[in-house]
């Protein structure tokens, strides 16, 4: 009985904070809401050693899936590490081993990353008109405004940047002039002072490129996409970890599989202080993004279900 009461208290607190956050967001003037992108980049996948650092932290900590990134955040993959960020409903950033990636800026139409070392891919199946993704390295900056597959490899004295699938970008070497990177092209920037820029035909896809292609194809083939708004992140996880049901009052809802008896929302995770959104729920379940940032949880015949709400063009993100 006591455990049941504790669960109810925790759930009530979680739902209260969530509803307060939604109300606060609704009261915020549009100019303030639009000063940062509507949905933060989501850490959607990790494998092996992946570390996270936020400005003000004493040290690096283990990265947690479903963490929303804020400007200034840093991620690092160890020798056997991999990570994935979702930055759009059809756009992903992935890092291979020994890579440091930072989020420098996040605005409605501008997303800026910095790759200090290692290997990063930007698989952008869609880029909204007017939106720019910038990738900074120690000796050059790359701007992307078109869908495509982009890969950047960074070492101490050399950066290579490759475009594929009709991708096109602009490179500005440190202290140099802008150069267009055409589709299926590789540019290599050598040196940090007065860097030299050379261009080649894009090399053949390697094993990591092929893995990136296949993973994105898989993520975009989610059945759950039929039931949620197109801008919702983490839809593929709903296929793997739950089922959809039609119930009176709420219509089509999603029910998680494999949760223990007596489980309730807001009991498997923690609140993180986001520098822009304030207190934000970070759930430890791999599926714990969409059900906590869109729609609402409802109790149906003794079990909890997520009601995504009506399908809209631009769903509102809630911390």
What are these model-derived regions, one by one?
Residues 1-11:
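Bacterial N-terminal signal peptides that target proteins for export
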Residues 3, 19-25:
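N-terminal targeting leaders that route proteins to membranes or the secretory/organellar pathways
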Residues 8, 41, 46, 63, ...:
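Functionally constrained cores in energy, signaling, and assembly domains
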Residues 10-20:
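Bacterial N-terminal signal peptides
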Residues 18, 36, 43, 68, ...:
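Generic structural signal for beta-strand residues in well-ordered domains
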Residues 25-186, 215, 221:
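Flexible, surface-exposed loop/linker segments and immediately adjacent secondary-structure boundaries
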Residues 188-319:
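Low-complexity segments
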